[in-house]
Structures are given as C-alpha cells and as structure tokens.
C-alpha cells in the first residue's frame, strides 16, 4: 500500500464513500508502520467502540454521513455511564479525533467533523495516576520473596520491575543471552554484528564494562518488540543482589525450553509459546502485590479464604494490587529519592526527561526536602 493511497487529492472537495470499519482497518495498518504494537492495540481499543456505535446505534455505513450530532450522542452516551475517568475519556476522544483526521485526509469525512470532537481538558495533576507502588511496599514484597520464594520466577519479575523500572514488554523480550553475569558472558557481545561499533572500539568498551547487567534488545521479527523500537535498546546495570538472584533462577528454577522461534526466554513458560506473555507478567504483578500473598494482614478486612481476588482470573479485584506500570512509577520515585538525576533515569528506563518529571516521579515532599537539605549543606562545605 502506497503512503498516499488513501490521501485526499489536492484541492478535492468531493467525499469518497468509505465504511467506518474499513477506515479503522486502514488507519490501524498505517499506525503499525511507526508505532509500537502496544500503542496500536490501545488505539484499536479506543476507536473500535466508536465504530461499533456508529454501525449499531446510528446505522452509519458510510463515513460521508457522519456529522457533529452523531459525535454529540456518542459523547453523551460515554459520559452518562458515570464510571469513566476524565483521563480515560480524554485519551479515547483524542484518539477518535486522530482517526477522523485520517478520514478527512482520505476524503471520507467532512472537513469540520474532527474538530467537533469535544475532548475534555485534563490538568497535569489529573493526568498523573497516584497509585504508584510505594518504596516500603516494594521492599517488603522483595524481602518476602527473598526469604520464601528465592530465585523463583515471581522473585525475578518483581526484582527486575523494581530495580530496572522496565516495562513489562521489555522484561518479556529478554533472552538468556541478554543476561550478563560473568566475564565469559561478554564474549557474546563480540559476535553480535548489530552493535554499531568497530572491533577495537568494542574491546575498549568491554574493558570498562562492569558486571552484572542485562541488555534490552528490539526483535520485532520474532515477536518481542520494544515500545521505543531501536531507540529502546540499551544495557542496564543491575545490583550484585539481583545478579545473584538471576544466576540462581537460571541455574535451578527456570523452566527449560525455547519459544516458537527457537529462542531461550529468560522468563520462560511451560505453556505455549514457551515465553511469558505481557498479560502473564501483569497477573504475577497483581498476585505479589496482594498483601495476603506476601505475609501481610489484609487491609480491606477480607477473609483470604473467601476473598474473590484469590480466585483464578480475579487477581485484579484486590484494591491493593498494582500493575507493572505502578512498579515503574514507584521505581522512578525511588530512584529520584536516592538522588538519581532525571536524565539518567530517562536513559535507563527508555523514556523522556519530561515524563520522568511530570508523570512518573511522585515524591513524598518531606522526603524530597531532606535530599535538598543535603545539597544545601554542600553549598557551605569548605
């Protein structure tokens, strides 16, 4: 498909018929060219209900017929539910506007329609979800796993989420060969042709490398893309403690096997395709953040023996659970509280300094003031 195949002809005002579902399919195909799979999936989830509404409730078979009245009724229907968050509505309607702007370029939607999408304004404070994983909770979880489930897959997942702040998709993408624990492991880098450095330069680099570390790699051709694609590829140092846990897991507790592409996943699974899924990482994150699963009393006055959140497929029903993204937010705050500059966090976690400062970093203000006090004292050191 040519890039301009569905673009409106220059100066053309005449609309060309296009069904809503056809437009959605074409638009998503175009997004796949430069967006991460997870981003395209989120676009699909946001726009598909709109398309289904147009077809089922408004009887629209041709986007030429779409007008502001249809948008108003869809908007009213979404808001009338009462349980949708303002931030969620902002994201959905913003994506729908992008979809309609594509429809305008394709001469399928009237030029004024996209601007009639009423996107609610969301302040900076409203954009930030405050449900991070607090530092003390993370430490308690890791201490429990270290004592009772040492080097288990759950221990590895939780430790990696907290110490690296990586996305779930990045953890899923790790292979055994991406884990560097001993000097001999560095030999693997000498035979990788896609590092972009000459042999002599590489040897100088390796001479100064400190172990242990992991290397996040973008491998979309075998179904493990990184959200930031090639720019998300990066080596990340890990602590000696995490390195020891990784080593013990690999030697003793990892389920042996390969995935459907013959690769050896770090986070393997006994189920096909042999590699844990992103949703699988999410479920494990939910379980280890249930207080009753890590030796704590239930803060919600529930009986663990009867709690529905203990049942298979219901882990997210516990009010205390946190997704991998909340580990990431908590990790950023932990790094900042320990004095890490935003620029270094952004590099380590493959994000932007702006996001580190505006979204991820959610400090306890008194703790952050104590850090500033240390810096103030340095001003007067002799």
Regions found by a protein language model. Give the residues of each.
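Catalytic-site neighborhood detector that most strongly recognizes the C-terminal catalytic loop/helix
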Residues: 34, 349-374
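Basic, alpha-helical nucleic-acid-contacting "clamp/cap" segments
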Residues: 194-272
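N-terminal core-binding DNA-recognition domain of tyrosine recombinases/integrases
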Residues: 9, 25-128, 254
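Basic, Lys/Arg- and aromatic-enriched nucleic-acid-binding interface segment
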Residues: 2, 139-168, 172, 261
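Short, basic (Lys/Arg/His-rich) helix/loop patches that form interaction surfaces
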Residues: 58, 282-347, 354, 362
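Active-site/catalytic core of tyrosine-dependent DNA strand-transfer enzymes
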Residues: 239-319
């Amino acid at each position: 498909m040519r890039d301009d195949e569905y673009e409106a002809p220059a100066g053309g005002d005449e609309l060309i018929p296009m069904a809503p579902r056809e437009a959605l399919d074409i638009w998503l195909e175009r997004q796949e060219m430069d967006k991460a799979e997870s981003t395209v999936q989120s676009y699909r989830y946001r726009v598909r209900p709109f398309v289904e509404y147009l077809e089922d409730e408004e009887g629209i078979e041709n986007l030429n017929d779409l007008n502001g009245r249809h948008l108003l009724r869809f908007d009213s229907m979404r808001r009338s539910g009462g349980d949708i968050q303002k931030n969620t509505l902002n994201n959905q309607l913003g994506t729908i506007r992008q979809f309609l702007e594509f429809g305008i370029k394709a001469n399928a939607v009237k030029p004024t329609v996209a601007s009639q999408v009423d996107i609610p304004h969301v302040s900076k404070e409203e954009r930030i979800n405050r449900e991070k994983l607090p530092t003390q909770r993370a430490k308690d979880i890791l201490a429990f796993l270290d004592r009772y489930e040492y080097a288990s897959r759950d221990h590895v997942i939780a430790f990696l989420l907290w110490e690296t702040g990586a996305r779930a998709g990045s953890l899923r993408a790790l292979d055994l060969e991406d884990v560097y624990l001993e000097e001999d492991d560095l030999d693997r880098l000498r035979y990788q042709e896609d590092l972009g450095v000459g042999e002599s330069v590489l040897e100088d680099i390796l001479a100064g490398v400190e172990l242990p570390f992991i290397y996040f790699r973008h491998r979309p051709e075998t179904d493990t893309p990184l959200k930031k694609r090639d720019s998300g590829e990066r080596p990340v140092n890990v602590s000696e403690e995490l390195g020891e846990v990784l080593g013990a897991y690999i030697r003793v507790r990892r389920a042996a096997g390969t995935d459907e592409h013959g690769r050896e996943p770090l986070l393997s699974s006994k189920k096909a395709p042999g590699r844990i899924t992103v949703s699988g990482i999410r479920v494990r994150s939910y379980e280890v953040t249930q207080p009753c699963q890590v030796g704590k009393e239930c803060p919600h006055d529930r009986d663990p023996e009867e709690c529905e959140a203990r049942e298979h497929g219901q882990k997210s029903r516990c009010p205390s659970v946190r997704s991998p993204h909340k580990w990431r937010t908590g990790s950023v705050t932990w790094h900042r509280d320990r004095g890490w500059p935003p620029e270094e966090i952004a590099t380590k976690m493959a994000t932007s300094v702006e996001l580190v400062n505006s979204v991820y970093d959610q400090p306890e203000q008194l703790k952050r003031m104590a850090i500033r006090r240390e810096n103030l004292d340095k001003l007067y050191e002799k």
